A protein has these predicted regions:
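Glycine-centered hinge/linker elements that transmit conformational signals in sensory
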Residues: 61-62, 113-149, 194
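Short helix-initiation/N-cap motifs at beta->coil->alpha
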Residues: 52-58, 146-161
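Hinge/lid segment of periplasmic solute-binding proteins
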Residues: 1-31, 75-78, 97
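Beta->alpha turn/N-cap motifs
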Residues: 170-178
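Short glycine- and hydrophobic/aromatic-rich loop-to-beta-strand nucleating segment
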Residues: 32-36
Length: 204
């Protein structure tokens, strides 16, 4: 066998192994969650590094929204208008990433999902809660249809990177774009796990 396989994290090769033979090699790992501006959360008195569950995140986002709405952070963050931006126009964000959080819990592995003849969509209700959570903390909370026009560049380069929003559902791949806009801000980004309420919480 291949010598490198003994150095791989347990379980990582399950989906590319059949009849004891490994047919694939991992070459990159990406993480996604709520990428957030540490300075904004700290200024609001919120330790985002401790946020894991749906309820904790909802409460913290609610506290931050209240401070934004009252103008308490305006002096330090003049462009800040909302907790989140939700790029609904990007189907890979809503369909692939957000959807996978719910669908991934239905199967023990990618292989099992591939071979399955049915999809029960057991966690549809929790997925709706997750989507509603994100909508609730955008500037379009009262007009969700407007989110259909929000794309990647509006949420990252024109959102998080300029301090217009405090967080966005994205992954570690946004760092170079944020760095191009604001190096200091890019170096102060963190990631909060995206929770599937009562099912999978605290995972990136």
């Amino acid at each position: 066998g291949e010598g490198w396989t003994k150095h791989v994290v347990e379980g990582l090769l399950d989906d590319v192994t059949q009849d004891g033979k490994v047919y694939g090699m991992p070459y990159a790992i990406e993480g996604y969650g709520f990428v957030y501006n540490k300075d904004i959360f700290e200024a609001a008195g919120i330790d985002a590094s401790k946020l894991k569950t749906y309820d904790e995140i909802d409460k913290a986002f609610g506290e931050l929204k209240s401070k934004i709405d009252k103008g308490e952070l305006k002096d330090k963050f003049p462009a800040l208008e909302a907790v989140l931006e939700f790029p609904v126009k990007e189907k890979w964000v809503t369909g692939l990433h957000t959807g996978n959080i719910a669908l991934g819990q239905e199967f023990d592995s990618n292989k099992q999902a591939y071979e399955s003849k049915t999809l029960d969509f057991k966690y549809a209700s929790q997925l709706k809660d997750l989507i509603d959570l994100q909508v609730k903390y955008t500037k379009h909370a009262n007009n969700p249809a407007a989110l259909n026009a929000v794309d990647y560049s509006m949420s990252v380069g024109g959102g998080l990177a300029i301090g217009r929003v405090a967080a966005v559902q994205q992954g570690n791949w946004i760092y170079p774009e944020v760095k191009e806009v604001d190096q200091k801000l890019a170096d102060r980004l963190g990631m909060i796990p995206i929770p599937l309420k009562g099912v999978s919480e605290g995972n990136i």
